[in-house]
């Protein structure tokens, strides 16, 4: 038995690796734009939970004897939910909006084992630094934030521009170890059952 990560996120994989788990990586093929459109008007937490669930549900049938984890993160700032910026220009625009402000990073988790499905979200408050225009442009030029929810990373270059967080650091990086641990316990497993030791 193993953990299957329904994600191509290197950050989610690194979180599990640093916690002693070498997951099988099986990225989910989900039309996120269509799903987001269908969820229009839903609460932010529900949106990220449903995105995570869709990813896990696509992958789970291929691994009936394994624990499948789907995840998704989005940044809630000024009552607007933001995903990945994808472009340099969008990254710069977002950083000019979020610098010096507080936002909430919401990470949805879906953990599936057989017929059992556990869906939960985790929210962490982020206090962004007053980053300079030059640093914002250079950060965007690095390419690092283009495919990250909220246009930032906590564990790499983006860490320079985060003053503080309130909540679970692993959730900000992309996968809450406390949420996954609680789900494993509910499924009758120990976290250590999946350690590669």
Swiss-Prot record:
Protein name per the record: Nucleoside triphosphate pyrophosphatase
Main localization category: cytoplasm
Cysteine pairs bridged by disulfides in the record: none
Domain of life: Bacteria
Cellular component annotations (GO), alphabetically ordered: cytoplasm
EC nos: 3.6.1.9
UniProt-listed HAMAP family: Maf (MF_00528)
Lineage, highest ranks first: Bacteria, Bacillati, Actinomycetota, Actinomycetes, Mycobacteriales
SUPFAM superfamilies, per the entry: ITPase-like
């Amino acid at each position: 038995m193993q953990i299957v990560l329904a994600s191509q996120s290197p950050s989610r994989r690194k979180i599990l690796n640093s916690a002693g788990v070498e997951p099988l990586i099986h990225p989910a093929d989900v039309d996120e734009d269509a799903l987001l459109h269908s969820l229009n008007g839903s609460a932010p937490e529900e949106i990220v939970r449903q995105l995570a669930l869709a990813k896990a549900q696509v992958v789970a049938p291929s691994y009936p004897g394994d624990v499948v984890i789907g995840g998704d993160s989005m940044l809630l700032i000024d009552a607007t939910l933001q995903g990945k910026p994808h472009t340099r220009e969008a990254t710069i625009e977002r950083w000019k909006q979020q610098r010096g402000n507080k936002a909430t990073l919401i990470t949805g988790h879906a953990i599936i084992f057989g017929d059992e499905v556990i869906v939960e979200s985790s929210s962490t408050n982020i206090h962004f630094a007053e980053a300079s225009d030059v640093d914002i442009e250079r950060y965007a030029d690095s390419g690092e934030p283009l495919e990250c929810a909220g246009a930032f990373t906590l564990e790499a270059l983006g860490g320079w521009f985060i003053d503080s967080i309130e909540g679970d650091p692993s959730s900000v990086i992309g996968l809450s170890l406390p949420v996954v641990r609680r789900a494993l316990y509910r499924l009758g497993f120990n976290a250590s059952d999946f350690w590669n030791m």
